[in-house]
Amino acid sequence: MTRLQKGSIGTLLTGALLGIVLVAVVFGGEAALSTEEFCTSCHSMTYPQAELKQSTHYGALGVNPGCKDCHIPQGIENFHLAVATHAIDGARELYLELVNDYSTLEKFNERRLEMAHDARMNLKKWDSITCRTCHKKPAPPGESAQAEHKKMETEGATCIDCHQNLVHEEVPMTDLNASIAQGKLVLKPEDDGDDEEADEDEDEETEEADDSSDSESASSSDNSDNEDDNNDE
């Protein structure tokens, strides 16, 4: 074996060793960054953690999900999404943790809607893959719910388009399709149901007022007739 051949083999072995080390560092680092202990090492994340443990998603059927189960895509096929999430979103949130004051829940709530929307947009981008990890082919009861689920096939909707505010403190729902189209946070319009109920209540009050007015008029007329009869007598 010539010196050149020995050098080539040495280079290949060195490259392979470095590759193994790099893969171990990347996968090990990703696993470490996905732990709940790491997520909640930032003070601001202690608030969502407490909300998670009080939600219906925690403890049901003996399942205790952590931050990563909803916010980080799992599985080797989604590893690139997990790395990108930590690299981009993680860096941004670390910066915001340093420049913002999250010392109280009230201060945290000032950015809650923005943070919730960012998380929703991630789920939208991933086709709610972390939801589907647990909720496999959901078949909701009732025609109305089944019709809504059809939107996932016909309108490009995904779980997070409708199922918001399930775990953390409630904030206004956001229209994710409109947000993507306009490149900014867009709130969902409020339901017309409340307005219709208010209109119905107003109509009922008007009818009651009219009935009351008619009754008073009839009573006044009767009293007037009685007075006339008395005068005639």
UniProtKB/Swiss-Prot annotation:
Heme 4 binds at residues 159, 162-163. Pfam families: Cytochrom_NNT. Transmembrane segments: none annotated. One of its GO terms (molecular function) is electron transfer activity. One of its GO terms (biological process) is anaerobic respiration. Keywords: Electron transport, Heme, Iron, Metal-binding, Periplasm, Signal, Transport. Disulfide bonds: none annotated. InterPro entries: Cytochrome_c-type_ET, Multihaem_cyt_sf, NapC/NirT_cyt_c_N, NapC/NirT_cytc_sf. The gene is cycX1. Heme 2 binds at residues 67, 70-71, 168. The keyword Nucleotide-binding does not apply. Residues 191-214, 224-233 have a biased composition (Acidic residues). It is found in: Periplasm. The record marks 165 as: Interaction with NrfA. This is Probable tetraheme cytochrome c-type. Heme 3 binds at residues 131, 134-135. One of its GO terms (cellular component) is periplasmic space. It comes from Nitrosomonas europaea (strain ATCC 19718 / CIP 103999 / KCTC 2705 / NBRC 14298). Belongs to the NapC/NirT/NrfH family. Residues 1-28 form the signal peptide. Heme 1 binds at residues 39, 42, 45, 93. Binds 4 heme groups per subunit. The lineage of its organism: Bacteria, Pseudomonadati, Pseudomonadota, Betaproteobacteria, Nitrosomonadales. Residues 182-233 are annotated as: Disordered.
